[in-house]
Amino acid sequence: MTREDQIARVIDENTGQRAVQFKNFLSLLGIGEEAANDYIRSRHDRPATGLSASQKRGRLLAEQFIRCYNKTPDCTERYQRVAWRSLFMPTEIMYAMDIMPFTTEMAAAQFARMGRQIERMETAEENHFSQDLCSFIRTAAGAVIEDLFPTPDILVTSSHLCDPSAKFAGFASIKYKRPEFVLDIPYGIYGGVYEHDVTRIEEAVEYVAEQFKDLVGFITLHTGVEFHEERLRQVMEWSNQARKWMKTGNEFSYYEGTPVFRGSKDIDYAANLMQTWGTEKIVDVYRTRYEEFVRGAETSEPLPDRPRIHWYHLKPYYKNNLMGYIEEHAVIASNMVNSIYWDDMDPDDPFRSLARRTVMMPGYCPVSVRAKLTTQWMVEGDGIIAFYPKSCRHFHSSSRIESEIFKEANIPYLAIDGDCIDNRGDDFAVVKTRVDRFIKGLKRMKTGAGRGRQPKYVQQVFDRK
């Protein structure tokens, strides 16, 4: 069988399987296909003008989701090449080659929002997935076993931050009989403010850049899609524009403007792990977000002077009382997952630029480095809440070290042992007591001591253009 015949066979198999999987997904929700099509059309017929940033983002993600099932926004059938990607795998090369990313962890979060996650996790646990495994992965594994997700053309995974993601991709690769590509990321390349070891950084950048070139060949081999440099340059330009607006919004809301938004909702953007980098529409989403911040600061009544919190990690996506309770008594003024830690990328040197952004992620370095980096830019009087799932080995295991570093820096710190997806161990009454004590301590401090001024290190580390 020729390569062209193999690709045609995959397309034919995927087309049939995705039709069944879409019906399975709708059945889970208790929705008929005709009703679903009517809803999809009505949602996407509305002009983007006048939509909020959150609505634009939601519509973009919904459109990407249905396209993975070969559905267009007007509900016609069109085959879409799909790459399952792990949460921290860059997406620009995929968009440049007309490959739609499908992020299983994001789908797991959506299951939790709908209250459909427990059954998926139980399915996974009944099939030998351990209960102490990441709940995002368990939910996704259950969905795979129940045949709810769209069959991929390929799977692409990175090795950093999420330890079980490559193992899960290997499981899915065997299940669907589709090829997997693993991007190997060296650990601990980001060195903090001074970044002394230039040689080590450049070697890591070159190592990962060569793998991105291999990824292009992998995609062409298994999908038949040819690579065009000019298309990747355009995608990189869109990522740079989106970066500018996201970063500008972050800085305005934290240092200059009154936080008029619900910070718990802003965590939903989860920009530095999102699959929308490289799309034209995400530029408009982040621009609109910034404009909403500015407009809100100019027109809204000042909020009561409440303690301000920087949020570490993600949040519970299931229905919960925690986030609303915190925001009754404090402001979530910033968060880890929206931080923009990288420089503008060079569209004329795309592989090295993507590699540099990937290896220089502060979250994938020694705990002491990323914690001390946080101490350089936080406003005096603000505190940190770290919501760490016990199943997330990478972050949960770091809380003791972080606590000691932040205590030395006089930054109040609270680590909450929770879970983003699995609510079976949720105990709000216990957590509430700890939150009350923490916020009471923040109120005793002098809040807002440096508000409106950026510490000098922000210019050195976060404001590099």
Predicted regions and their residues:
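A charged, amphipathic alpha-helical module
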Residues: 2-81, 206-344
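Structural motif
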Residues: 84-88, 157-161, 311-316, 388-390
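Peripheral docking tails and interdomain loops at the edges
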Residues: 2-14, 400-465
